[in-house]
Swiss-Prot record:
Subcellular location: Nucleus; Nucleus speckle; Cytoplasm
Modified residues (Phosphothreonine): 348
Annotated region described as Disordered, given as residue ranges: 1-70, 198-219
Protein name listed in UniProt: N(6)-adenosine-methyltransferase catalytic subunit METTL3
Region called Gate loop 1, residue ranges: 396-410
GO BP, one annotated term: mRNA destabilization
Quaternary assembly: Heterodimer; heterodimerizes with METTL14 to form an antiparallel heterodimer that constitutes an active methyltransferase. Component of the WMM complex, a N6-methyltransferase complex composed of a catalytic subcomplex, named MAC, and of an associated subcomplex, named MACOM. The MAC subcomplex is composed of METTL3 and METTL14. The MACOM subcomplex is composed of WTAP, ZC3H13, CBLL1/HAKAI, VIRMA, and, in some cases of RBM15 (RBM15 or RBM15B). Interacts with NCBP1/CBP80. Interacts with EIF4E. Interacts with EIF3B.
Domain characteristics, as noted in the entry: Gate loop 1 and gate loop 2 regions are adjacent to the S-adenosyl-L-homocysteine-binding site and display large conformational changes upon ligand-binding. They may play an important role in adenosine recognition. The interface loop contributes to the heterodimer interaction.
Disulfide bonds: none
Alphabetical list of InterPro entries matching this protein: MT-A70, MT-A70-like, SAM-dependent_MTases_sf
Site keyed Interaction with METTL14: positions: 438, 441
UniProt region (Interphase loop), positions on chain: 462-479
Amino acid sequence: MSDTWSSIQAHKKQLDSLRERLQRRRKQDSGHLDLRNPEAALSPTFRSDSPVPTAPTSGGPKPSTASAVPELATDPELEKKLLHHLSDLALTLPTDAVSICLAISTPDAPATQDGVESLLQKFAAQELIEVKRGLLQDDAHPTLVTYADHSKLSAMMGAVAEKKGPGEVAGTVTGQKRRAEQDSTTVAAFASSLVSGLNSSASEPAKEPAKKSRKHAASDVDLEIESLLNQQSTKEQQSKKVSQEILELLNTTTAKEQSIVEKFRSRGRAQVQEFCDYGTKEECMKASDADRPCRKLHFRRIINKHTDESLGDCSFLNTCFHMDTCKYVHYEIDACMDSEAPGSKDHTPSQELALTQSVGGDSSADRLFPPQWICCDIRYLDVSILGKFAVVMADPPWDIHMELPYGTLTDDEMRRLNIPVLQDDGFLFLWVTGRAMELGRECLNLWGYERVDEIIWVKTNQLQRIIRTGRTGHWLNHGKEHCLVGVKGNPQGFNQGLDCDVIVAEVRSTSHKPDEIYGMIERLSPGTRKIELFGRPHNVQPNWITLGNQLDGIHLLDPDVVARFKQRYPDGIISKPKNL
C-alpha cells in the first residue's frame, strides 16, 4: 500500500512540474506549428491540456535514443475500447498494459501493446488515470494502471462519441487551419515541454542509484557518530574503574569477619548424616544397580498385621496419633550399619572422638553456662529479678481459635506481658502463626521493638519431604511458620551476616520449634545471657533461662539471680498477686 501511494504522489509531482514548464514556455517562446504533424492542430479542445508525443522537426535538436518516444497513429476505435474498458467499475486495479491489451483485443481489430501503452500515457497526462511508471516505456516492464477516475472517463467517452468523422474534416479544413494558426503557439509549447519532460524522466532512473548511495553513506555516517557518542570517555572509564574497585573492597570479607566465621566453623567431622534420596536400602540398590546400598542414612518400612501396603504412606508418618491402628505404611530409621563395608570405621568416628576434636581443637571456645529454668505462670512472675538479657525468645500460646493440647492467652494478656523490662538493647525472636502474625507485629511495637527481619521455618516430614497434610490452617494446610525478629535500642557486639532467614527442619511434637534456632541465635550473640518464654523441658539450653508452666521445678545457678529470687519469693512459691 505504501509503494502505491508513493508512486501516485511521484506521478502527481511530475505532472505539476510539466504544467509549470508549459506555462513558462508560453510566456517566453512563440513557437510555430509543426507542418509535418498537422493532425495535432486538429485535436479536440479537451485534449489540448495534455502533451501528445510528436516527432521533432528537422531543424530542432534530436533527443537521445534512450528518451525518444516513437510516433504512433491514434486509432479512434482502440481509444474508444480502452476508455470503455477503463471505465468499467468491475475492473480490478492495479492492472498492466498486457492484461488490458488481451482484454480489448478482438480477431477483427487486434490491439498492440505499444498502442495501448501510448494511450495509457496519454490518459495519465490528462489525469484520467494514474500509472506507476510515469511517462517511460519499457517492453520488459509494461505500464501499470493503479487508479482510474470513472467520472472523467465517462465524460471522455461522451466527447469521443460526439467527435466528427474523417469525411467531414475536409469540408471544414479552412476553419481548422484558422484555429490551428491561433493555437500554433500552444502546440509548439506542448511539443517542446514534452521533449524536455521525457529527457528529465529518462534521467531520473539514473539519479535513483546515486540517491540511494548517498542515503547509505549518510546512514553509515550516522551510525559512526552514534557509536562514538555511546563510547565512554576517559573520565567515565576512570570513574567506573574506581567504582568497581570500591565495590570489590566492600564485598571482600574483612579479617574480623573471617575470624568470626572460622570461630563458628565445625571442628572435625560434621555431626550430621545425610539421608539417601531413595529412602529405603532396597530402592537405593535398585536405583544404583549395586550390590550394597550407599553410605547415607536410610529408612525401614514398618509393616504390621493391620498395615495395608496398597494404601501407601501415612500422611503424618512418625507424628501419627494412631500408629498402633493406622493401616498406612510408616517408617523408622534403619540404624543397621554395614560393618563389612571397607573403610566404614574411617567414615563413622565415635561420638567421644568427635567431641574431643570439637572441644580440644578450639582452645578459645567460649564456655557455656549450664541451663536454668523456672516453672511458673509468666503472667504473675516478677521478671525484673532475672536481670537484663541480650536476646529474648518467646513462643506464646496464641489464641488462634483451634483445639490445642495446652492453655492459651488472650490478646490483652499478651499485650500486658512485662517484656520491656527484660532488655535495654538487644533482639526479640517472637514465633507467630495464623492470625497471630498481625497481633505479633502489634505487640512488638507496643513493647518498644522495631521489626527488622522475619525467619521462615519450612516444615518437612520424616522422609525429609515438604509436608502436604497438616493439622493447622483454615483454607490451606500450613507448611511453614514465622518468627518475627525485633530490635530494641542500639545493640553492640552482635555478629551480622552469618546465617540466612530460612530454616528447613523436620516437624516433631506439637509446637516443638526447630533446634536450629538456638545455634542461629548463639552465632548472632555468642556467650551472652538469653531467656526463653513459654518454654518446655525440651527447650532448656546452655546460656539460657527458660520460663514456662510445664517445666520441672526451679533450677537457678547464677548467684545474683538466686539472691534476687529468694529475696522476692522467700518461700519459693510464685502465686497470683492479690491486685490482679
